[in-house]
């Protein structure tokens, strides 16, 4: 099929466009087609072949101003985006155009956003932990280098703040390259993140790709792939260990559902697209470690109506190595990050990988918190006085642990007025071990709230 192949628009229904080509020059599926609109170039992607000479396409930009009869030019291949060092410090849209008003990008190479996942022989696995400096994460559900991590939570429980803190900590402590894909989230948050990165000096090691809430569904469905393509280049061509942040993977599913309905497909469970698992698999299987380098991905997962059994979060679960679940009950206690230590888990929390001390402290913490959870009904009905001395001690330690799992974040400094803390894993394990052993039974529980290491809690108690 020759490049420079021109067709004509025959139907426009919102973001879905039908274009007629000659029979012998019908563009392939997933090809990018360019249309010169009144406000510049509009890129659409082929989704279906209808009859012998018409393709149905999904637009990556608003189709305002397009009319039937306009010319459309087939590019002869998928959407291609700039890759390489030139992308660092810049903001792109889904089709790889810079949107930060800093001029053109002098990228040496471009790569298509659709490509197969690495073959079985090319993949490599490691069992190294990625230290985040966030106590609750490092202790209870540690992250695997080159693994996939999901941050699950309903609306307003702190997923984006946690992602911003991870970007900040990992860029400062590990100096790695990051790619951030903003998929269908708030433009204001994207702007805040960009300014935050400039202030903290990590912008030069990050490429940002945004397809926010106001974009058409085609853009929101493909922007995750655009960010992933940039990350793959750093992994495959430069042998880097890259971090890929996706906020929010649910919006990718949501956009897919919108596109599916617009293309006239029969909906599946809860109104989602019938191809939900396939689309999710095509994206997730490309996020992996190869012999050349690794991609560690952290994905925020919005949970509709706090229901973890909804098909969108449930499909995402299957692909993850670690899940960090944010809980509204913990938000109500005023403890941040609101990570649920009993619901969050990780494949890496295994004595063979993290060592016996880390494993036993983590399980000890969960045991105490679980016992406290069981005792809460008794406390609510009968009060603390009816508990045995042993249970009273358990409750006291559990409340200290609960508060010690909180931590001030660097990225939230302007809201809280508290300096952010990065806590090394050794310090985290030591702190919780001392609480479990009863070394700090005499310290009031308020001293453990929003501190870094255990020494700070002791100092805070002395200061009172």
UniProtKB/Swiss-Prot annotation:
Its EC number(s): 7.1.2.2
SUPFAM superfamilies reported for this sequence: C-terminal domain of alpha and beta subunits of F1 ATP synthase, N-terminal domain of alpha and beta subunits of F1 ATP synthase, P-loop containing nucleoside triphosphate hydrolases
GO MF term (any one): proton-transporting ATP synthase activity, rotational mechanism
Highest taxon of source: Bacteria
Record SMART domains: AAA
Listed GO CC annotations: plasma membrane; proton-transporting ATP synthase complex
Xref: Pfam families: ATP-synt_ab, ATP-synt_ab_N, ATP-synt_VA_C
Catalytic activity, as annotated: ATP + H2O + 4 H(+)(in) = ADP + phosphate + 5 H(+)(out)
Key words, A-Z: ATP synthesis, ATP-binding, Cell membrane, CF(1), Hydrogen ion transport, Ion transport, Membrane, Nucleotide-binding, Translocase, Transport
Binding site for ATP: 153-160
Family assignment from sequence similarity: Belongs to the ATPase alpha/beta chains family.
PANTHER family per UniProt: ATP SYNTHASE, ATP SYNTHASE SUBUNIT BETA, MITOCHONDRIAL
NCBIfam families referenced in this protein's UniProt entry, alphabetically: atpD (TIGR01039)
Protein name: ATP synthase subunit beta
